[in-house]
Amino acid sequence: GTGTGAAPVVAQIAKELGILTIGIVTKPFSFEGKRRMTQAEEGIAALREHVDSLIVIPNERLKFVSEQKITLKNAFEIADDVLRQGVQSISELINVTAMVNLDFADVTAVMKDAGYAHMGVGIANGRDKAEQAAQKAISSPLIETNMENARGVIISIVGSMDIGLEEVEQASTIISNMAHPDATIIWGAQLDDTLEDEMRITVVATGLGDNGKEETSPADDIL
């Protein structure tokens, strides 16, 4: 299929052209069967050879984060939306103007030739929003990696106009403490006047190696 067949070819061409190549993939639902999972494993093995960074999202974990009832009808729609959010989050790290900007060079520094990656998004409101958003971002139940001992970390913080310096520092410290002591850590911050007493944090952590994976079965659908 497009994921298991075409994506590794496209990734190889991009890598040969010197283009930063990031794979965001989903694993099959359990009800899709063993054959589907086997095809996924073959596809991910081929893709892994040609991407700089790889983020894996197991469809089976959607039930832990979706507020909707997971039905046969909407299961694949929810999975596709998660993939969209992943691509959008990385794109916005580069393209959205912020008080403290992240640019393409920042993303490249962390994600080039970096192996398995963790991506998490945390959103929280109220008095403890900095701590809660940071904890959610580093422990997303969707991602089959953890960011412990990561060698590269990108932190993007978006907050309401009343966000304090101490809150930014608290969130950044919580996330940084999860990474390797010598990790490259790059962060950006943006104020959003449409938010009210809210903080949103996107974390991308790389350089995890195979030890960053909680499971070894790879992906099914590939962007």
Which positions does each model-derived feature cover?
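Tubulin/FtsZ superfamily GTPase core signature
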Residues: G1-L223
